[in-house]
């Protein structure tokens, strides 16, 4: 029989093996987060919304400035019942206007648009957080899948070695045909598990590649010091929930964006109320022209026809059919919606933090339990080997014990990366990955 201690040592050596030298294009977690910030389509869309908000601010500011326009009007006309000929008229002019007073609507609108721009910038930061969270999930999933694949590869190699060894024993008449067939069946099952593990790695890598917006023909590997962590005891202690909650609320761009949006909505309500305000406008105009189809006095017409004017207009709204009242009501509804959104997002954050914190604590305990389970299954396999050699244990029971060890190793891997992911997400919510 193959020495079981040697098998166990080889199994763990291969399962824990991490390639030291990767091909060109190796990515750390920090590299992935930077690439996602640079290339994410979601972030690109958010930045475009920022640009749109910036343009709105500029438009709001320019609306309070003077306007100047020039005009050139060419007219061809006739009097069919008076003169039997066509006449030509040319009018030239330049005019300008400036709003002296609009009840403060323009300045309020500028303030509102500025706040909206600030809220949009914070919303972009929240989108960045969301992208980072997706990258973290994909990155840790790929690490876990890769480690499970190494476990599956080790299992296949050991099962192949055992099958080859059993083939020799069968030829020597030391084991039965049944034992050899079971060994072959075990090898096929391990190869099937290996294919499943390969598919998981491929799926996880595709997910991460798409988040990083890399071409599908780009080959890349990931590397992380997390693969060498053996126990949660070697990690920093989790913060208290109160500290986590305080840090997360202070560092959450989404809450800040909602808070600024509420202020912007309040300004919009004030702007809507200015619809019935008196408006004072200063205007100026300068114009000239000429007429007649044929004339030698074009120059004189332009000269003596020149006219300048200045006007002061005062608009006093009296009845607007309820338009201003409707705009105020709509603005108040939007303001209330912004306040409700802020409260809902705050509750959502609290719920997410509570779940995430409990998951992190639970994952640490599951990780420790999985370590003990692997140790227990390893000892059980040593005993099973001794019983098998003594003829007190069937090969089927021996295979069951080997499979239990492999399952325990997979459980350990999943628990490990679940814990690491939970901790990274806590850091993300605390703003430590910005």
Task: Go through the PLM ranges and name each one.
Residues 30, 216, 409-434:
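Acidic, low-complexity, intrinsically disordered peripheral segments
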Residues 1-11:
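Bacterial N-terminal signal peptides that target proteins for export
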Residues 22-69, 216, 222-263, 346, ...:
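Bacterial Sec-pathway N-terminal export signals of envelope proteins
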């Amino acid at each position: 029989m193959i020495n079981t201690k040697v098998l166990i040592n080889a199994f763990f050596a291969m399962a824990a093996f991490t390639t030291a030298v990767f091909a060109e294009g190796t990515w750390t977690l920090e590299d992935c987060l930077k690439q996602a910030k640079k290339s994410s389509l979601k972030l690109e869309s958010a930045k475009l919304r920022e640009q749109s908000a910036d343009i709105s601010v500029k438009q709001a500011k320019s609306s309070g400035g003077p306007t100047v326009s020039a005009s050139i009007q060419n007219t061809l006309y006739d009097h069919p019942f008076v003169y039997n000929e066509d006449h030509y008229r040319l009018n030239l002019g330049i005019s300008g206007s400036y709003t002296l007073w609009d009840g403060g609507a323009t300045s309020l609108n500028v303030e509102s648009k500025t706040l909206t721009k600030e809220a949009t910038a914070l919303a972009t930061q929240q989108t960045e957080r969301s992208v980072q969270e997706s990258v973290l999930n994909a990155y840790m999933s790929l690490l876990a899948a890769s480690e499970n694949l190494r476990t599956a590869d080790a299992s296949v190699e050991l099962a192949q070695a055992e099958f080859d060894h059993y083939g020799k024993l069968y030829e020597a008449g030391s084991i039965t045909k049944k034992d050899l067939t079971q060994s072959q069946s075990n090898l096929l099952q391990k190869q099937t598990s290996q294919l499943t593990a390969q598919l998981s790695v491929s799926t996880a890598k595709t997910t991460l590649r798409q988040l990083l917006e890399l071409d599908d023909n780009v080959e890349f590997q990931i590397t992380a010091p997390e693969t060498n962590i053996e126990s949660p005891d070697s990690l920093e202690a989790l913060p208290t929930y109160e500290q986590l909650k305080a840090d997360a609320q202070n560092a959450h761009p989404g809450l800040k964006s909602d808070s600024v949006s509420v202020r912007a909505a309040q300004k919009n309500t004030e702007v809507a109320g200015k619809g019935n305000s008196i408006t004072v406008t200063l205007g100026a105009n300068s114009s000239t022209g000429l007429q007649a189809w044929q004339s030698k006095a074009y120059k004189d017409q332009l000269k003596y026809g020149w006219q300048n004017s200045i006007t002061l207009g005062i608009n006093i709204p009296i009845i607007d059919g309820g338009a201003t009242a409707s705009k105020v009501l709509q603005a108040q509804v939007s303001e209330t919606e912004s306040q409700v959104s802020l409260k809902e997002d705050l509750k959502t954050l609290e719920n997410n933090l509570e779940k995430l914190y409990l998951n992190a604590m639970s994952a640490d305990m599951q990780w420790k339990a999985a370590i003990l389970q692997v140790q227990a299954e390893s000892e059980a396999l040593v005993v099973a080997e001794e019983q098998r050699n003594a003829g007190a244990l069937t090969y089927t029971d021996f295979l069951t014990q080997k499979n239990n060890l492999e399952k325990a190793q997979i459980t350990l891997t999943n628990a490990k990366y679940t814990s690491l992911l939970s901790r990274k997400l806590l850091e993300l919510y605390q703003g430590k990955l910005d």
